[in-house]
Amino acid sequence: MNVQLNEIWNRTLELLKGEMTEISFNTWILTIEPISIDSNTITLGVPADFNKGILEARYSYLIKNALRQISHRDYNIYFAIPSQTPVKPVAQEYTEDSNMSFLNPKYTFDTFVIGNGNRFAHAASLAVAEAPAKAYNPLFLYGGVGLGKTHLMHAIGHFVLSQNPALKVLYVSSEKFTNELINAIRDDKNEEFRYKYRNIDVLLIDDIQFIGGKERTEEEFFHTFNALYEANKQIIISSDKPPKEIPTLEDRLRSRFEWGLIADIAPPDLETRIAILRKKAQLENLDVPDDVMVFIADKVASNIRELEGALNRVIAYSTLTENIINVDMAVEALKDMLNNSKAIIINSKTIQEAVARYFHLKTDDLKSKRRSRDVSFPRQIAMYLCRDMTDMSLPKIGDEFGGRDHTTVIHACEKINNDLNNSTELKRTVEEIKKNITGG
């Protein structure tokens, strides 16, 4: 298969999966096989006339919209039944060398919406992009799923290349790094693997937490990190947790990740969520009333990915039902999502209440200055759960427990994390409290 088309289609699938019900996605979208691409048209293979009719009538808008977001181009879509229709010729074969960076064109600094939760991370990313290996090296970005870490990493890559196209920039997930290493070992191509990763100017590696516990991957990345750092090359890393909280990560890697600058990204506040939706509508020329965007932003507070997915669902619902977009229609379009999101709200308050109830304390005890073990131990568990079950930053967690310093929170999380590995009783306690919180 054409590698360029394969890359575009895989990214399109990821986008569509977040915008459709699981049944619809599995029934209709997963039956599609990308066939060919030229300057104007993408040909998609489908198994039968029935599938073709449904896709053309119900899902062509969604697919075209997703393709436009991924490729920044308006492709025509042609649904073909391979056994009946000749395959369109491929215009140009894609090679790794022609696009080594693997950067998503829609993730730039221009499309990034700055808010209170990401202002520091954005400033740090821009500083690194303006002066690779001279400002902060490595730059370590961390935060929950869908908060913009990957967007900032791609934005750095785009900016660097816009200033100096001759530089070698590579974005890769830790999973891809691991898989390529496995293949290199299997095929006896270790030297080719090392040459690829140690001869670039800017390495952007996403979701580094997944290499924890993979000894061979950690070993290889350790030497890759050293080679790049000693050659004065820029390294940008992302994770869902700060280095100290990544379980099973080797200490030598953890210490290196802390050499440069660590910046966290918190969930966006209401104003930022509204701004994100306005930006998306502007970029894609969508006509969405302001009160609808305010409604969506108020109801979907989890992360940016779900926020944009909710807007896409409203747009698709309007198109398919031929209804004007308004708040009532948005309520109908998002009813499944809103029902699920209302079920459980997990924040510091619900966690403190659950822990206090379990240990027969008052929530004020957890926020107090008392240091006796009957209070300090439950407090440490509550801090650990805040870190594990929410996207709160360390300083914010400290504030919620009587204004304690973030280092106290780090100590509590590390202690509970270590004790969980050695105590079956503590593991049962924590799991029971979690069930009480989630209603599981």
From Swiss-Prot:
Chain intervals for the UniProt region annotation (Domain II): 94-101
GO process annotations (BP): DNA replication initiation; regulation of DNA replication
Localisation: Cytoplasm
GO molecular function per UniProt: ATP binding; ATP hydrolysis activity; DNA replication origin binding; lipid binding
Residues the record lists as binding ATP: G146, G148, K149, T150
Annotated InterPro entries: AAA+_ATPase, Chromosome_initiator_DnaA, Chromosome_initiator_DnaA-like, Chromosome_initiator_DnaA_CS, DnaA_C, DnaA_dom, DnaA_N_dom, DnaA_N_sf
Region (Domain III, AAA+ region) residue spans: 102-318
Alphabetized UniProt keyword annotations: ATP-binding, Cytoplasm, DNA replication, DNA-binding, Lipid-binding, Nucleotide-binding
Alphabetical list of Pfam families matching this protein: Bac_DnaA, Bac_DnaA_C, DnaA_N
SUPFAM superfamilies xref list: P-loop containing nucleoside triphosphate hydrolases, TrpR-like
Quaternary organization: Oligomerizes as a right-handed, spiral filament on DNA at oriC.
Family statement drawn from the similarity comment of this UniProt entry: Belongs to the DnaA family.
Role noted for this protein: Plays an essential role in the initiation and regulation of chromosomal replication. ATP-DnaA binds to the origin of replication (oriC) to initiate formation of the DNA replication initiation complex once per cell cycle. Binds the DnaA box (a 9 base pair repeat at the origin) and separates the double-stranded (ds)DNA. Forms a right-handed helical filament on oriC DNA; dsDNA binds to the exterior of the filament while single-stranded (ss)DNA is stabiized in the filament's interior.
Protein's name according to its UniProt entry: Chromosomal replication initiator protein DnaA
Provenance organism: Ruminiclostridium cellulolyticum (strain ATCC 35319 / DSM 5812 / JCM 6584 / H10) (Clostridium cellulolyticum)
Classification lineage: Bacteria, Bacillati, Bacillota, Clostridia, Eubacteriales
